[in-house]
Amino acid sequence: MRKQGPANALTGKGRRGFVLMVITIILVLLAAATIAYMGQMQTEYKASSMFGRDIEARMAAESGIEFAAAQIANKESDPSIDVFHNPTLFYKRPLGEVDNPAGQVRFSILVPNRTSDQGGIPRSGMTTENSKFNINRLIEFENDTDEDTDPFMAISYVPGMTQEITNAILDWLDTDDSTDRTGGAESAVYEALAVPYSARNGPMESIDELLKVQGVTPLLFYGEDANRNGILDPNEDDGEDRPPGDNADGILDFGFRDFLTISSRERNRLPGGEEKININNGIVAEMHDFLEDDADLGTEVAKFITGYRLTGDQNADSQAQGKLTIEQQQLVDWIAKNISNGELGQVTRNGMDLSQPPTASFRSIYDLIDAQVQVDIGGVPTTLTSPWSSSDGAALMEQMIALERKLTVLNDEFIDGRININTASREVLMAMPDMTEAIADKIIELRPPIMAGGASEQMMATRLSPIWLLTEGVVDLPTFKRLGPWLTTGGDVYSLQVLGHFDVGGPTTRLEAMIDATQTPPRVTFQRDLTGLGRGFDPAILDPAN
């Protein structure tokens, strides 16, 4: 038997060392794999958590839109609800309560506050589309018989607007294919483009259609406010260094979309949906009976309004006195023809002969103020004085608010395109016929400031009707009556932005929406995700400590 030599013994020790080294390497690799796996799992956990938080923020923002619609619906039964600027109601509303600030999700309903050249802090609330000029009404300016009414002058205060663009808009809206307007464009121009399309030749169905109109560029349409927050941000005031292209003049140039709309609309019905009393009703006897039967109006009101329709206001100037519309005149002619044929007997109310056709109509219910009519009552010439006098401003405010709820001058279910004098910008105010720069500046000057705690409720309580322009001395009565058909302090189509956000960290979702309250219940008609444009508002504004 041979003895194992030293070399063999050394080889055995080497093998044991080699195994130990292999085991060590394996353990190191396993540890590295474990660490890598744990890191990957941690990354996956963070990604999953962030994804979940992103969903929470989005759900919060969408909840904010539904909450806004609910508050608009509540406003119908409780007009005291302030949806213009109400931080208590719309600012940092929690979705549930949690102890961990990083897990507390909220929504804030905001509207960019375009109160200066640099913008301002956002309002906590909504704005009505009646704060803008309804571009579909532009064609009315051209068809108006008043020589002082000019389409370009109406929108010339909108930044970037030109005569050529105005003419192109008119060509887009009118029903013909005539190209006699300087700088205008009809379907033939658009159909020759690389991607052809035709002019609408009718009312626009979306304000975005302006981008199809010749001469309207994205910069003109959107302006320099790239992230749509209403604030002049550094990248919006640095020339061509960063998008958007701007002129670096220290002024935030807003776009057409901030001044123009196609959605401004108001309900022309009572809160329950019943029809208002139309004081331009072609059948005057029917109008009289509706007025007389109303418990809040009665015989004297019915007599005066009927007398006005028969003979007109003796105190009115030529521009403020309403004439019969074509439809009204046709109805009057039909009634007169049948009376002369003996098919309709004599019709009288309160001693007034309603067999004679009416000669006047109302441009707005404000024509009633300080009016005076001369009418035969029982065959005796009689002077009737308006029950609504401008001598007592406080009383007139209450009376006009009541009349606005009950009376109308139109049969239509909706009223389109009036301008909210409490919220419209100077550029939009100047679109109204008979508006002057001095009047527009005074309206802006008298608005309460937007503060963190809300607008001045006491001041706004006296401005529930456009009549405040008269009672606070902004305009005289003849001017107010001429402006009357354009004036409102309401609007039933609302626009807003909603942020879904956390108290600490986390993603933010920003949505833009439009809510149509001319329908019951109010309906969300438009929603757009603005998250890709960034948070938009300084995080300090949303800090729960503020």
Give residue ranges: language-model regions.
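Compositionally biased linear targeting/interaction segments
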Residues: 2-3, 16-546
